[in-house]
Amino acid sequence: MIEDKGPRVADYFVVAGLTDVSKPLEEEIHFNDACHKVAKPKEPITDVSVIIKSLGEEVPQDYICIDVTPTGLSADLNNGSLVGPQIYLCYRRGRDKPPLTDLGVLYDWKERLKQGCEIIQSTPYGRPANISGSTSSQRIYITYRRASENMTQNTLAVTDICIIIPSKGESPPHTFCKVDKNLNNSMWGSAVYLCYKKSVAKTNTVSYKAGLICRYPQEDYESFSLPESVPLFCLPMGATIECWPSNSKYPLPVFSTFVLTGASAEKVYGAAIQFYEPYSEENLTEKQRLLLGLTSADGKSDSSKTIHTNKCICLLSHWPFFDAFRKFLTFLYRYSISGPHVLPIEKHISHFMHKVPFPSPQRPRILVQLSPHDNLILSQPVSSPLPLSGGKFSTLLQNLGPENAVTLLVFAVTEHKILIHSLRPSVLTSVTEALVSMIFPFHWPCPYVPLCPLALADVLSAPCPFIVGIDSRYFDLYDPPPDVSCVDVDTNTISQIGDKKNVAWKILPKKPCKNLMNTLNNLHQQLAKLQQRPRDDGLMDLAINDYDFNSGKRLHMIDLEIQEAFLFFMASILKGYRSYLRPITQAPSETATDAASLFALQAFLRSRDRSHQKFYNMMTKTQMFIRFIEECSFVSDKDASLAFFDDCVDKVDMDKSGEVRLIELDESFKSEHTVFVTPPEIPHLPNGEEPPLQYSYNGFPVLRNNLFERPEGFLQAKKNKLPSKSSSPNSPLPMFRRTKQEIKSAHKIAKRYSSIPQMWSRCLLRHCYGLWFICLPAYVKVCHSKVRALKTAYDVLKKMQSKKMDPPDEVCYRILMQLCGQYDQPVLAVRVLFEMQKAGIDPNAITYGYYNKAVLESTWPSRSRSGYFLWTKVRNVVLGVTQFKRALKKHAHLSQTTLSGGQSDLGYNSLSKDEVRRGDTSTEDIQEEKDKKGSDCSSLSESESTKGSADCLPKLSYQNSSSIVRLTGTSNNSAGKISGESMESTPELLLISSLEDTNETRNIQSRCFRKRHKSDNETNLQQQVVWGNRNRNLSGGVLMGFMLNRINQEATPGDIVEKLGADAKILSNVISKSTRPNTLDIGKPPLRSKRDSLEKESSDDDTPFDGSNYLADKVDSPVIFDLEDLDSETDVSKAGCVATQNPKRIQRMNSSFSVKPFEKTDVATGFDPLSLLVAETEQQQKEEEEEDEDDSKSISTPSARRDLAEEIVMYMNNMSSPLTSRTPSIDLQRACDDKLNKKSPPLVKACRRSSLPPNSPKPVRLTKSKSYTKSEEKPRDRLWSSPAFSPTCPFREESQDTLTHSSPSFNLDTLLVPKLDVLRNSMFTAGKGVAEKASKWYSRFTMYTTSSKDQSSDRTSLSSVGAQDSESTSLTDEDVCHELEGPISSQETSATSGTKRIDLSRISLESSASLEGSLSKFALPGKSEVTSSFNASNTNIFQNYAMEVLISSCSRCRTCDCLVHDEEIMAGWTADDSNLNTTCPFCGNIFLPFLNIEIRDLRRPGRYFLKSSPSTENMHFPSSISSQTRQSCISTSASGLDTSALSVQGNFDLNSKSKLQENFCTRSIQIPANRSKTAMSKCPIFPMARSISTSGPLDKEDTGRQKLISTGSLPATLQGATDSLGLEWHLPSPDPVTVPYLSPLVVWKELESLLENEGDHAITVADFVDHHPIVFWNLVWYFRRLDLPSNLPGLILSSEHCNKYSKIPRHCMSEDSKYVLIQMLWDNMKLHQDPGQPLYILWNAHTQKYPMVHLLQKSDNSFNQELLKSMVKSIKMNDVYGPMSQILETLNKCPHFKRQRSLYREILFLSLVALGRENIDIDAFDKEYKMAYDRLTPSQVKSTHNCDRPPSTGVMECRKTFGEPYL
């Protein structure tokens, strides 16, 4: 076996002929049936004569008179003439002289005699032989041509003659040629025609079955063995020994072609040349001598005869390069009969087979020089969805004419038995191949033998339809079977027998047939002009005729036009057939695959023209049509072809002119690029000697193996290797590949939309989604829960639809359907089909095939509904009714501004989590049906609502108000929008409700209000606010609304929550003063429905009605980056601890309920975090006891005392994060401030990130009630006197130093943390004193466990939850919270929920200065994604990430030096998918934009993020221990706190309550001096935030800080150490990466090319990062941009680029995306060249007093604090002109430098940072900016640059569509 390596020009070279074992052909052929009547061979006709019977002339001796026609009429040549004589034709047979080769008729009065012809001038009796009578002036004569004396043995001679009278219904007999001239030209009588038959006039021949003489290569290829029957096809009439007269000429070689069809319908093409060679008389047996007539009767031999035999050389290939093969074989034949030669013939054969490359799009033409005089050209096969064919339509039309060609089409489409015959074997193959091509899209399903050997002719007896081509000499031996329609290509006649005679082209539908005939007639005339050459009679000239290249091209074009005409016809008669296909939409029955089930046949027939029902009935009953319907309905290798046909049908449908082109040549055909291949090299001898001419042949030799020149390794067979993919082009389409029609259609759409700004941005978006779906198989593959991943993709589809991308790419639906089939999800496949129909897309054949395959072959869920399900239904109804009642009771307390639309559609969950975990198909699928409706408007990873301003632009109306800063009352559509979205979920969702309480419902409701776009009006719950002292981050409307309501009535916390939504967190201290819970409810049910958790594995999306999803969207505003929190919450980070729980109980909790986090009360009571634990302790013990008795009791029974607590819980849930409750958050600390105690709302200075990520983390359900700990009589100040992370802890540094180096696999924290948690927690519950001791004892251990990995216990807890793949628990992120929350103290709760919901932790996210937005949504499945998508505290966050990636697309134009931002780059791209450039919006020049990527390696010894087990990469913890592991304490070391966010140095005593209250602004951690020095010496740079707008708020400027050095591509504040104190433990960060930023159109093309060349697995391995960085980083950017989950970020972890310095084997490293934090930046400080800093950085420097930027103030006095504040004030007043003027005025003072930054960006970015991103309506800003720009005075205009111009519509549309990256 030889290994296959891509397509080959030729597979085998074969020599066939007479072998020693050949048997006589007559022994081999046995036709036992009656069809094959043996015909008697007839001698050739040597003479023809005319006799006039009316004058008494008689038939001469040995002549035969033709008295009657074939049907018995008189054969008088003047038939019916009144006055003409009766003239008859006579002929004589014999071998005494050369036979006649042609007959003709001469009209003497208007024609001349052709050369070589003779006239029969007189009768045998001397009278004139004028057929029209001697009296007529118009004389007509019979003419003939005779063969030469030394004629070749295969000369065709006339063997039969007849007369026909067509007017009497006669036609030429089979194989007879009609002379198309009427012999009777009198006024009376019928037209009379002469017909004759020609055959080979051979004598003395013995035929044998041909055998294989030799072959090359000797070994078979893996995918294609040499068929045994090849010699039979090489010599179809057998190998013969012939006896010739000695003066006979050698016949020229005959070229023939044949096609072999394998069992899999794969075609192999053969090209052969037959020739004769002398045969030694000595080798003849006596019998052979007798048969050949060499021995006379008296025993003497005849010496005047010579003996010859025929031989054939042949090439076999999968590609029909017939013309090239003909030239090569002819060259070999000539080489064998000439010589001597330097090189052996074997060298030429192996050179052609191995050294000639296969033509490809890159090298469409290969010119092969065979010798100085011989060459050939190989052209790339036309890359078309049409089946590959060796036929030529021009040959068919030229030989048969339009009418017979169309009649042949009718025979084929109605499945007749078709026998095509000719004496020219190459023409035979050409015509039959063209015939099976012209019936496309049907594929001939029956026997098909284009050139049938005589030995296989019994196929003609087959009882089924067939298409067989046969040599016409067959009819010299046999009569044709009676039920076969015979087509004689040589004479252009079709003979039908019996009832088949009525089947002709006229039964076809009239209009399509008329169009077809017109086109064919026109092309037939063109062919006649083009082909003025004599008809090829099967013989070849020795000189290779290179006919004019242009003529060849023209012939090829005519060929395509003929094919297109037939294609147009087929598309016309089948128009609209797809609408009659019936998809399988339910569990398939036994008859599901019957054609009757798959196709509405009767409806189809009724839709056709009634007058042609006969034809349609015949066609639809054929096997071919039924097969066609099956192929359309299921996956087959014909899918690409069928999709192409559907495209043709659409074109025919639309086309009115008839000028549409259905077949378009691809560009490579037009290319002139040609590769030249030289002849084999002649060996060079020393001293310049001539090589000897040692090879000469006296016939074609038997090939010698040792003379072949084989390529290296050619014979090394690969054993045990599966046959590789065949080189045949008919393999099914790979999953990712679009059809050519889809690619062309996408190009057209892109071209059309590129000039329409609104549509261009959507076009780019459409391509981005398409890219994600192409990568979807790789993503699903790594997801633990395939079902969730698929549902995520389904949600993305729905989201695409909501974005009104017209139309979405069909490949997206197709890939998802394929995956549904692959992973057994038929119900989802049905939904995808319905979504497709909803989007207005008719699935093409490929998509439809994969759909039916998915629903047919997958296992459908059982239909029986369990008792559990039915009882759950009853329970839900009861609960639903109750909740409605309670909601009504409390309705009076709800603010009028609340929206009632969202309450009923929150998707209550009726599935237990156990069921979800099990993936119970029955319930799951039942649920799916309901869930489907609920999640219509959301999809995944909150991405719908996360896209800055215009994610759902097409769907939602924009703000009408032109107010830049969003205020109350400006929104007309926000409420409507929300209700519109939420109401898509119908009331039936009530039937799957969970144990939700009314409060919970309201809680959700309040969060629901927040789901809308940041660029949309933010007015749901906001009242207008006075901007006075309001901190820039506070959502003013919320606060004011809160205060106004308090005036009218005493609002309950629930009301406040309703009002505040996400902004509630900022006001936590205000509320906590006034309320405190009566009881701590811990039995709250989970908020999440199954629908919520559907996608947890594969996405971060909680589906639309998950409250936290709503909140997360809006919570951006206040919650994400609360910098003060960072300082204040350090203590808490130390303290989180977790209760022990019975794993079994936890499991039950999973399935039944989850607990609300506890209230955090008066901060002042106990500053030690543990002091906050006390109140929960008793409640916890009590609850645990109850739970041990009966879990469900506490679940289902709402507590009577719970109302107020519920309100608070609800309120706090909306704001807090798990980690924060462990510390008095800055909000709460500020509550201790006197001003805050006066409840002066504007004073709440929650320093929040102003430029927020599009999807902020979801708020965790953690309450922070200030008064909470007051329930404890004794403050527990001393309880946590020595926390592990206490800055004063003497062991800290030592412990880190000693333990960090311990083996990563054997680490204290991995051993101790869960057990310590258990121990500690149980001790806490035992009593206060014990708890105090436990705290001290535990803190010492935590010091070791956490510090050894630098907070690895925190990482452990976080990653354990994240890593705990959601497949195992089927929980959403919140579910994990709940399952951990149980009866636990608030501290424990916060810790555990924090572990899970990193996303919500304020410590983590809000304060995470480094967080550029919710973390990468690329996380791998489930929790892992959630975890990765969001961040724990700044300190904690990087404990859960191995890698942080910062990407900016901001680029600099090379021409004008202006900074071009993301949306401007997008707007400048073109529709050309080969153009990498964009157009600069400022100077109009093109340039190549770049993505700048910086990677921070956060790994260190002990936390390398290795794969946990080979089997389940994502399941880091077995479920049995997961609950405890996940609950490990989230403790944050000082170094941890300092990592990446803020190394804060403040001097104050942690234990001093009063001092703390005074210093609430900067609670920071003291760093031991020596540690500090080390850290600082190693890292002179201040640890920087990843976002310039989130730098830490520090009271004092640290004078010891050194000046910042810009090291990266990001703003200065984005650089620096992520862990200044722990820097020595980090691996070096990988080098920055810069790659071209490509349009999605270009990326798609590149990705397809990559997948095609390297396979689907290419994007699942880390080498993708290293080998294809451009495609990789662009994909990462786009997926992150749209918040789509992906496996790609995980590949960074094990890539070569990121592991240059790592000693750990890459295959051991985790590739889980949850460990990679990806942040997208709008700006790129590295590119800034202006001397000053951007205004938004200066704003932070001035207003936030960031030490890191204080130095900027000294060098940058132009823009002082007052100036910036006045600008911001102007912007609040909708005045952009003022700031513009101020900036221009300031800049004019130093006119010497060339300004690079634009006014637009300066003012916009300042607005976003100063006023909060969520408060700025950028659309309104753009309007105001344009108006202000138009107002500029001429002198001001002179100071502006091009980059100051307002953004164009295209730029604005791209920003709206894709949202804004982060500052």
Curated annotation (Swiss-Prot):
Q: Does the keyword Transferase apply?
A: no
Q: Which gene encodes it?
A: DENND4A
Q: What GO molecular-function term can you cite, just one?
A: DNA binding
- Extent of Low complexity compositional bias: 936-949
Please give the GO cellular component terms listed in this UniProt entry: cytoplasmic vesicle; cytosol; nucleus
Chief subcellular location equals nucleus
Q: Which InterPro entries match?
A: cDENN_dom, dDENN_dom, DENN_C, DENN_Domain_GEFs, MABP, Pentatricopeptide_rpt, TPR-like_helical_dom_sf, Tripartite_DENN
Per the UniProt entry, what species is this protein from, by scientific name?
Answer: Homo sapiens (Human)
In this chain, where does the modification Phosphoserine occur? 731, 1015, 1035, 1099, 1151-1152, 1225, 1240, 1251, 1281, 1508, 1587, 1589, 1591
Q: Where are the PPR repeats?
A: 772-808, 809-843
**Which function does this protein serve?**
Probable guanine nucleotide exchange factor (GEF) which may activate RAB10. Promotes the exchange of GDP to GTP, converting inactive GDP-bound Rab proteins into their active GTP-bound form. According to PubMed:8056341, it may bind to ISRE-like element (interferon-stimulated response element) of MYC P2 promoter.
**Biased composition, Basic and acidic residues: where in the chain?**
912-921, 1269-1279
The short motif Bipartite nuclear localization signal is annotated over 917-933
Q: Which domain of life is it from?
A: Eukaryota
Ranges of residues in domain uDENN: 192-364
Induction data: By serum in low-passage fibroblasts.
Domain named MABP: residues: 42-200
Q: Where expressed (tissue)?
A: Expressed ubiquitously. Highest expression in bone marrow, medium in peripheral blood lymphocytes and lowest in spleen. In brain, breast, and prostate, higher expression was seen in normal cells than in tumor cells. Expression is regulated in a growth- and cell cycle-dependent manner.
dDENN domain location: 523-641
- Indicate, by first and last residue, each region the UniProt record lists as having compositional bias (Polar residues): 1297-1306, 1348-1371
Record protein name field:
C-myc promoter-binding protein
Protein's cellular compartments: Nucleus
Q: Which GO terms describe its biological process?
A: regulation of DNA-templated transcription; regulation of Rab protein signal transduction
- Domain cDENN residues, every copy: 385-521
Read off the PANTHER family from this record: C-MYC PROMOTER-BINDING PROTEIN, DENN DOMAIN-CONTAINING PROTEIN 4
> Which portions of the sequence form the region Disordered?
905-952, 1075-1111, 1177-1202, 1237-1306, 1348-1375
- Keyword set, alphabetical order: DNA-binding, Guanine-nucleotide releasing factor, Nucleus, Phosphoprotein, Repeat, Transcription, Transcription regulation
Establish whether keyword GTP-binding is in the entry: no
